[in-house]
Amino acid sequence: MKLKRFFSAFLAAALLAGTVPAALAADIDSHWSKPYVTSLHELGIINPSASTGNYTPEASVTRWEFMRYINRAFDFTEKASISFSDVKSSDMYYETIQIAVKHGYINGTGNNKMDPEGTLTREQAATILGRLHKYAPTASASKLDVFTDKSKISSYATSYVAEAVSQGYIN
């Protein structure tokens, strides 16, 4: 459980930092995420950007990129059959999604879609982390008072976001 908490905290930091390809680059030298990015790279969870060699710490993370990070962090490899209308077997992220679905930490977005290239939201990340921990969130919804956009948090994610705040994964 401690290992899961460790990786979940790092993955949450990666989400907050944005897309985090790892290679020593000047664009991250003074960025708050540098120690997290460095650790994730050393653990083999993230790779350098082949095209730029930069970290781009303020860029967004897609849903499939976050799934890839989680699959690597937890060494998930077992696959499920999937049939999302927006995911084809020839897509580069097909196996990543098969693995994520098999391990039960992500669902589609409704209407038989996965939206793999969509930007991962805070509520989606919190829900994924909660499902990875397999906990029943117990944190009070008052934990969400720190967010000016709390009214925009989907009902399915409210308890997971509150728990992620309580656990210190997001703030």
Protein language model annotation of sequence segments:
Residues 2-36, 42-96, 102-124, 129-158, ...:
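Feature responds to low-complexity, polar/acidic, surface-exposed segments characteristic
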